[in-house]
Amino acid sequence: MRLTRPSLVSAASIAAVAALALSACGGGDSATEASASSSAASSSRLVVATTVSPITSIVSAVAGDNVTIEGIVPEGTNSHTFEPEPQAAELLNKADLIFINGLKLEDPTLQLAEANKKEGAEIVELGTIVLPESEYIYDFSFPEEDGKPNPHLWTDPGYAVTYADIVRQKLTERDPANAAEYQANFEAFKAEADKLAAAVSADQASVPQGQLKLVTYHDAYAYFAKNFGWEVVGAIQPSSFDEPTPAEVTGLIEQIRSQGVPTIFGSEVFPSAVLEAIAAETGVRYEDSLRDDDLPGAPGEAQHSLLELLRYNYRTMISGLGGQPTQLDALVFERTVPDTAFYPQ
């Protein structure tokens, strides 16, 4: 599995791109402008920009083929440290709607969007809308003193449905002619997400009592764990997203031993020699195949979706903790909406 390195763009670059975008809008060949104006007038198709692949997948599931959807954050990238290429400003300048997670996850992309969005465009921070501050989760990877709560709501299928409903509302406001289709697509997505939640609830009951405990590379399951009755013991990736200090490693080893954690979970997207060494030191099983935000399959394939990603990760965790994921294995998603979104790789 590839490991995509984040690109870097400075605040000065953001300002320069914004200036270029403004000058491009105000100048240029009149024939070119007339052609562009004619092209825009001839098409009422919405243009939507998204950030991480789970959000792109949700938007696509609701929008169907009525909307042009393009993601910004490549799959397999650490979304917390990702900074967009300056050319992302061009997409953001064309978009009618810009869907991001919010909760401080994509601040550089948000800054670029605010500097370059066209008049009338809307930036929709899904997580910030959904989660009241009283329900923010702060922990070892997201300490409260840093002011950035854990942003990973979409790993819980219930929150994924709430995201999808907001997407439906925003698309309907912009494109009321297709409101019935957006509603039908949302209801189909909700039905599949509800089946997934039911399968997880059934299968986690097969995990030996007291073993629904998570130690992961990336701290992505806090809201899922809270709502499904799991315990997040720790994560190897600290708030700085650098390698953990020796003291942090020692503390995590002590937690694993004292709480009887049976398995620790790494990521096939972000291999961790430190987590592997912790497993060897504690003698617990090491399962290194969680996919984080990297959707399975290739864009356009049926398995390339958020729900399939969640099914895969839930299955990996339940089996790794000694359970039997029989309901997850038997689950068949009835995908009727084509995914025509662009997912950067």
Regions found by a protein language model. Name each.
Residues 2-14, 21-345:
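Extracytoplasmic metal-acquisition and chelation regions
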